[in-house]
Amino acid sequence: MSFDPTGYTLAHEHLHIDLSGFKNNVDCRLDQYAFICQEMNDLMTRGVRNVIEMTNRYMGRNAQFMLDVMRETGINVVACTGYYQDAFFPEHVATRSVQELAQEMVDEIEQGIDGTELKAGIIAEIGTSEGKITPLEEKVFIAAALAHNQTGRPISTHTSFSTMGLEQLALLQAHGVDLSRVTVGHCDLKDNLDNILKMIDLGAYVQFDTIGKNSYYPDEKRIAMLHALRDRGLLNRVMLSMDITRRSHLKANGGYGYDYLLTTFIPQLRQSGFSQADVDVMLRENPSQFFQ
């Protein structure tokens, strides 16, 4: 796994994802190589060196695409292994054992993905449904815990609209996972400070990783929650990203692009009173400690 701890890291992104069949919308097929390479070059000029790519099997993952992007742009892409959430599971999640699902993850970590030399560096994006953990999602979380315990690779989760994060952590902890090796995704989609504080108190990292998606939750509220965490001295448990998933998110297609976090959100954060050191903690120091 290539990772540069001296640069910034986007903790939850997608470079190649295809949920278009499920969502009946071609915009959800993110696969435009030239446009994405240009955006990765732009990120490199702004100090980003690592992108954590959260597209796992059956979400449209493309290992060769990631390898090609790395070779062309020089950016590090950390690939993942796992299963997303119940609505997107292939049939065999129901029929295979927990141990078999865990072994699939271990194989992608230790041997490689889809016959390529690219190995998964993280167990992710493992998810739960809104307001509940289904039996199959619980099965995947247990398998992820087994794979983590065998390989030591960290776990990054998907919460649906900032629900079930505490329950995810309880499930992983019950199966032997050190919660300092877990980061909870999508904590920034509702007024969620109380739960965020509890998750951090348990030892986990939290991600504000849908930055720019103001139709879900406005960035000014994200900034207010980040201030509340800063005031409590808890920025050492926060990571940032944007969760780009659609063609329309790309700058070439009229979207805000992967660098919106750096060109728009961080300046807003700085203007609100955050120091450059605060920014560096969330974008460099925390990811470097967590993902390596």
Swiss-Prot record:
InterPro entries: AryldialkylPase_Zn-BS, Metal_Hydrolase, Phosphotriesterase. Beta-D-glucose binds at residues 148-149, 176, 178, 181, 280, 284. It comes from the Bacteria. It is an enzyme of class 3 (hydrolase). Transmembrane segments: none annotated. Gene3D superfamilies: Metal-dependent hydrolases (3.20.20.140). Zn(2+) 1 binds at residues 12, 14, 125, 243. Pfam families: PTE. GO terms for molecular function: hydrolase activity, acting on ester bonds; zinc ion binding. Zn(2+) 2 binds at residues 125, 158, 186. GO terms for biological process: catabolic process. PROSITE patterns: PHOSPHOTRIESTERASE_1, PHOSPHOTRIESTERASE_2. Binds 2 Zn(2+) ions per subunit. Its EC number is 3.1.-.-. Keywords: Hydrolase, Metal-binding, Zinc. Its cofactor is Zn(2+). Activity is higher in the enzyme containing Mn(2+) than that containing Zn(2+). Monomer. Catalyzes the hydrolysis of phosphorylated glyceryl acetates in which the presence of a phosphate group is required for the enzymatic hydrolysis. Hydrolyzes a dibutyl glycerol derivative suggesting it acts on phosphoglycerol substrates with a butyrate leaving group. Also active with aromatic acetates and propionates. No activity with various sugar phosphates, with various nitrophenylphosphate or nitrophenylphosphonate derivatives, or with phosphorylated or non-phosphorylated sugar lactones tested. Does not hydrolyze non-phosphorylated carboxyesters with long chain leaving groups. Belongs to the metallo-dependent hydrolases superfamily. Phosphotriesterase family. This is Phosphotriesterase homology protein.
